[in-house]
Amino acid sequence: MRVDIVPVGDVPAHVKRQASSSLRSVYDCEVVVASEQDVPTAAYDEARSQYRAAEFIDTATRATSGDKTIAITPHDLFYRRRNYVFGLAYLDGRGCVVSTYRLQTSSDGGFSNRSSSDVFDDRVRKEVVHELGHTLGLEHCDNNRCAMNFSPTVREVDRKEENLCGSCQRTVF
């Protein structure tokens, strides 16, 4: 399986490296980092000062031909009535998106004795695994350590692991 990572907007190189490394490690897949795509201006909702997540998926999937496509963006995303989302994917679909905007440690109000860059990198790794998992047919998992566990806040993201639990692994592999 080939997974294309599509930066939408200015995504730092280390974020692309973390995402690539995590996807290769967990899913044993080929990963290609595609060229940066422009932010879809029509996706911006002025009243919310946020972007519609689904349009980032559309932008990324149009730009590549991989088996799966994951858009990564530094912009704040929302979906339907949710205040924000870390990412969005369509179950068994081809594309998904991860926003790093709310994965920054300055946004969480939490605490950790680890460096903020390490915490951020871990969050990125977990969320790309999570969103790609949805495109592979995985739904949210009840195991709070599994990468597929629903994580509405960064505290839940921090609690889970980068890897899939045994049950989710059996479903995918």
UniProtKB/Swiss-Prot annotation:
GO annotation, biological process: proteolysis
Cofactor binding annotation: Binds 2 Zn(2+) ions per subunit. One is catalytic, whereas the other seems to have a structural role.
Pfam families noted in UniProt: Peptidase_M54
UniProt cross-references to HAMAP family, sorted A to Z: Archaemetzincin
Gene3D superfamilies the UniProt entry points to: Collagenase (Catalytic Domain)
Cofactor(s) it depends on: Zn(2+)
Signal peptide bounds: none
EC assignment: 3.4.-.-
Protein name: Archaemetzincin
Organism from which the protein derives: Halobacterium salinarum (strain ATCC 700922 / JCM 11081 / NRC-1)
Keywords attached to this entry: Hydrolase, Metal-binding, Metalloprotease, Protease, Zinc
Top-rank taxon, per record: Archaea
Keyword Protease annotated: yes
PANTHER family membership: ARCHAEMETZINCIN (PTHR15910), ARCHAEMETZINCIN-2 (PTHR15910:SF1)
Assembly and interaction partners: Monomer.
Binding site for Zn(2+) 1: H130, H134, H140
Positions annotated as active site in the UniProt record: E131
